[in-house]
Amino acid sequence: MISNPIKRVSALASDYTQGRFGADGKIGVVLKEVPDLTLYQVAAWPDNLATVSAKTAEATGVEAAPGPGRAVWKGNHVLLRVEPLKFWITGIFIPQLPPAEGTVLDLSHSRTHVRVTGPQAQILLNRYLPLDLRNQSFVPGSVASTAFHHVGITLWRSEVGFELFLPRGFALSLWELLRQSAAQFGYEVT
């Protein structure tokens, strides 16, 4: 296991206040930063996709790697297929690949993971994301690369809600937009 000597500081630290806000005590949206993100990108060469897919599935403890735009998980280990030849793995440290098979890149410090849940979460996100987030269209396990206020993000629908992977440099601005827009529904930061 790789040791992590760098002290992590949240990109949202200056504006992360827990509590209930807006709309007369009603809670339509719950916002949460998921701390201590461990995120690796695994890119396969086209001729080695099957081998790399099997290795990523084994590393996360799932039966098989997902197809493009999908995710699978076991416990806290998640395997997202963000592009046809690229996977993101969260929750674990992964072994290196031989250069002939593909590459591994640690993205842990480059993203902020925000979870958006609650009965109005879909409506809130559709104010910013050009995706059909209805339950029948963007089902749990769906993954999309999209734009949030002109910033490229990755969105995954987990079993509990919407998981946003925001570029660290834009995370605070996007967080502020989420909070401002969520006020109309009433929201809680946990």
Where are these regions (language model features)?
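Basic, glycine/lysine-rich polyanion-binding surfaces/domains
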Residues: 1-190
